[in-house]
């Protein structure tokens, strides 16, 4: 098997100059040298720490003066205590590079540490450092499994240093969440933290608040949370009586003929009706004009959404069907996007397409993007295996620097040059042949595919060829940790979508490392990618599964000119087609062209991120103003005071009835009534404002046809609408207080009409999801609760 290069870093990282790293926000050599000097000095205190009993070690940690982490002379002692505590509680002795990583996180950086280098332990030490400095720390993960696993694993270490630790999952009750947040360090997924922040915006009693004020966010898999999930808005929504999308329309669209009634573009990212298709729809609906003012924003939109669902959204690629329900697949992780759904019209169209009962629709009550959620924290830091490749986004959107941490042992993984084929069919044949060839030697193979359908097709062909293989994809993601842990066993062949199993180490010889030496002699884990991703960072994540902690390993990517990356970002007439008898492209330019396509794709994704951020930034600013007003109403007597000033006669009338028997109780009840009314109408006004913003965003791109700037127009309309929000809410509250009927035989007023919904879900809305070729609804799922 050909091996053309040895990498001691992720591909291309070794060629990045110090100046370029700085442009990406990387820490300077001076910063790194200072951190290493403190790590080396910590060794002087190791013996003293080892002589302390558990109680003495705990007291020593609590006596450290770490208020100013940048200048504290106690940092070396802290590192020595942390190393000793880790040794006693986890059986792991942190390497110097792990302590270096912890220090760079304490300096506010995102650290790049390769797979298997011990990020979890390094992050726990950094979290302990912040907590000992008096900060409240949220360790933010990508899912509930990792939040609980890491909290339970690192809990004894945290407690050995005199600190408290808690965790939150989707099953946690409100009381359990409050208890976890009261701890010095709280582990939770980004979704759960976001949901708690949103739900707190519906409480009407200060004692019902769950989420604390944000302080320190330490983010695991930082690139996934801060880049891949940055644009995902977590949305709190409530049940409503909005109309369900018309099923007759959805069924009608399903009967249309491709090419005759509708057409897709070359890369199958957009679909539109032909004239014949439009006439067929119009006739079926009684001769209407789809493009008339009456129908263009309603019926035509429904038709386009249904087309999108039927033609562009593919089962086992973008979603799976399980237990009579549609489950979305997270495009960057290759696993089920737990509790997620599309915007209602698209969700209903997909459900109808699959013959599944459509789920309930609703209205948005509040929303916050992951990016805005994280930017609430005064201090943000994190860790990942691929931070440098995300450096520009981290710097631009979070003002974060990146610190590359060297591996404890040199990375000796061999990365082969891409094998490029003219057609997908030729590529897939070559992939199967290559897997079989490597498997014959006993070397374990991990195959990374782009989607569920491809993983199952590769698995089917391997079984047919007599190669025993295990498939890991969104359909069996509950088993992923156990499956991926055995991917390094002798003779193992594991076919996996995207980054399934991320967060679980692949040890040579299997989880028990029984055949470690034998597998190492065979070359370690061999990673095969069945196509380049739209960002090099995801390629590097896949490659990084091999070569753990100085182990041997290898990787190779198979690509074709028919891959989505190439079709969307390269011109056909520039592709060399000369190939050998297997269909493999001979031209040495092939790999360079792939890299160019990837750079173009990355540029487009960055543009989309920046553009979406510009829309979301104003909404975030308006939300901050609303939250401040809401907190004032919730925590003070402002609601009562304003009502008393607005309607003094009615106020005194209600007050007299309430205080007739018990003055103190009556005053408290009156204050509660005023607060409930004010909060209800403020929340109602915000929900209406969000609905208005969603409506204008759906059509704002059309302003470009009139030579107007869509973003400027959106801002103008959003600012104008928000200007009257507070006054309108107060006026509505005044009217409610004046007109609310009295309760028979009881003092007070009837507030039964101010009932609040309880069902919540989240989803992502894009300006024009049916027309954007880089960020469509295919990759914009949301979370349903």
From Swiss-Prot:
GO terms for biological process: intracellular protein transmembrane transport; protein import; protein targeting; protein transport by the Sec complex. InterPro entries: Helicase_ATP-bd, Helicase_C-like, P-loop_NTPase, SecA, SecA_Actinobact-type, SecA_CS, SecA_DEAD, SecA_motor_DEAD. The keyword Membrane applies. It is a peripheral membrane protein. It comes from the Bacteria. GO terms for cellular component: cell envelope Sec protein transport complex; cytosol; plasma membrane. The keyword Membrane applies. ATP binds at residues 98, 116-120, 505. It catalyses: ATP + H2O + cellular proteinSide 1 = ADP + phosphate + cellular proteinSide 2. Pfam families: P-loop_SecA, SecA_DEAD, SecA_PP_bind, SecA_SW. Its EC number is 7.4.2.8. One of its GO terms (molecular function) is ATP binding. Belongs to the SecA family. Part of the Sec protein translocase complex. Interacts with the SecYEG preprotein conducting channel. Has a central role in coupling the hydrolysis of ATP to the transfer of proteins into and across the cell membrane, serving as an ATP-driven molecular motor driving the stepwise translocation of polypeptide chains across the membrane. HAMAP family: SecA. Monomer and homodimer. Part of the essential Sec protein translocation apparatus which comprises SecA, SecYEG and auxiliary proteins SecDF. Other proteins may also be involved. This is Protein translocase subunit SecA 3. The lineage of its organism: Bacteria, Bacillati, Actinomycetota, Actinomycetes, Mycobacteriales. The gene is secA3.
């Amino acid at each position: 098997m050909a091996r053309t290069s040895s990498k001691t870093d992720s591909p291309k990282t070794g060629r990045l100059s110090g100046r370029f790293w700085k442009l990406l926000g990387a820490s300077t050599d001076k910063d790194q040298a200072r951190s290493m000097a403190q790590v080396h000095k910590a060794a002087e205190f190791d013996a003293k720490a080892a002589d302390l009993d558990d109680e003495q070690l705990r007291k020593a940690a609590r006596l450290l003066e770490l208020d100013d982490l940048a200048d504290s002379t106690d940092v070396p002692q802290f590192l020595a205590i942390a190393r000793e505590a880790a040794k006693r509680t986890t059986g792991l002795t942190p390497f110097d590079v792990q302590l270096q990583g912890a220090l760079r996180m304490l300096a506010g950086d995102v650290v790049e540490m390769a797979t298997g280098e011990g990020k979890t332990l390094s992050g726990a030490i950094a979290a302990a450092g912040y907590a000992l400095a008096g900060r409240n720390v949220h360790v933010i993960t990508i899912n509930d499994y990792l939040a609980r696993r890491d909290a339970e694993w690192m809990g004894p270490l945290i407690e050995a240093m005199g600190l408290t630790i808690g965790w939150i999952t989707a099953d946690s009750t409100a009381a359990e969440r409050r208890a976890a947040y009261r701890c010095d360090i709280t582990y939770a997924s980004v979704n759960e933290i976001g949901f708690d922040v949103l739900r707190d915006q519906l409480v009407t009693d200060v004692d019902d608040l769950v989420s604390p004020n944000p302080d320190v966010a330490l983010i695991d898999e930082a690139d996934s949370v801060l880049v891949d999930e940055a644009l995902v808005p977590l949305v709190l929504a409530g049940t409503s009586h909005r109309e369900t999308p018309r099923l007759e329309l959805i069924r009608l669209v399903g009967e249309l003929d491709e090419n005759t009634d509708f057409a897709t573009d070359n890369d199958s990212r957009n679909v539109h009706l032909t004239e014949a298709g439009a006439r067929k729809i119009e006739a079926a609906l009684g001769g209407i004009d789809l493009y008339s003012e009456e129908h263009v924003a309603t019926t035509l939109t429904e038709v386009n959404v249904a087309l999108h669902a039927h033609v562009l959204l593919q089962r086992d690629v973008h979603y799976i069907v399980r237990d009579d329900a549609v489950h979305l697949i997270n495009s960057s992780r290759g696993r089920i996007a737990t509790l997620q759904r599309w915007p209602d019209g698209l969700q209903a169209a997909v459900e109808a397409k699959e013959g599944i009962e459509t789920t309930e629709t609703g209205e948005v009550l509040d929303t916050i993007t992951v990016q805005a959620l994280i930017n609430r924290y005064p201090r943000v830091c994190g860790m990942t295996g691929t931070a440098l490749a995300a450096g520009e986004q981290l710097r631009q959107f979070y003002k974060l620097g990146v610190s590359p941490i060297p591996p404890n042992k040199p990375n000796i993984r061999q990365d082969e040059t891409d094998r490029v084929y003219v057609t997908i069919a030729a590529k897939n044949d070559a992939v199967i042949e290559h897997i079989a060839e490597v498997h014959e030697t006993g070397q374990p193979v991990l195959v990374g595919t782009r989607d569920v359908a491809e993983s199952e097709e590769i698995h089917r062909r391997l079984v047919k060829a007599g190669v025993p293989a295990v498939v890991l994809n969104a359909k069996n993601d509950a088993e992923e940790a156990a499956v991926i842990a055995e991917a390094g066993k002798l003779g193992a062949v594991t076919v996996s979508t995207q980054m399934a199993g991320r967060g679980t180490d692949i040890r040579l010889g299997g989880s028990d490392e029984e055949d470690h030496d034998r597998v190492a002699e065979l070359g370690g884990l061999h990673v095969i990618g069945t196509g380049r991703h739209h960002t090099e960072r995801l390629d590097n994540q896949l490659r990084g599964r091999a070569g753990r902690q100085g182990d041997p390993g290898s990787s190779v990517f198979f690509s074709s000119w028919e891959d989505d990356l190439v079709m969307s970002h390269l011109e056909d007439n520039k592709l060399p087609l000369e190939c050998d008898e297997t269909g493999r492209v001979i031209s040495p330019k092939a790999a360079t062209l792939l890299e160019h396509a990837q750079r173009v794709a990355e540029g487009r994704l960055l543009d989309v991120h920046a553009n979406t951020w510009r829309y979301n930034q104003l909404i975030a600013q308006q939300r901050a103003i609303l939250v401040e007003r809401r907190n004032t109403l919730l925590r003070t007597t402002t609601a009562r005071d304003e009502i008393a000033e607005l309607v003094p006669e009615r106020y005194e009338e209600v007050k007299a009835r309430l205080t007739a028997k018990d003055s103190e109780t009556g005053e408290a009840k009156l204050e509660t009534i005023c607060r409930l009314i004010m909060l209800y109408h403020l929340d109602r006004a915000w929900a209406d404002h969000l609905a208005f913003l969603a409506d204008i965003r759906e059509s704002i791109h059309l302003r470009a046809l009139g030579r107007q700037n869509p973003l400027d127009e959106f801002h103008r309309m959003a600012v104008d609408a928000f200007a009257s929000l507070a006054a309108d809410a107060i006026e509505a509250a005044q009217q409610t207080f004046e007109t609310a009927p009295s309760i028979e035989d009881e003092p007070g007023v009837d507030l039964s009409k101010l009932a609040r919904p309880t069902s919540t879900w989240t989803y992502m809305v894009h300006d024009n999801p049916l027309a954007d070729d880089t960020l469509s609804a295919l990759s914009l799922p949301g979370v349903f609760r």
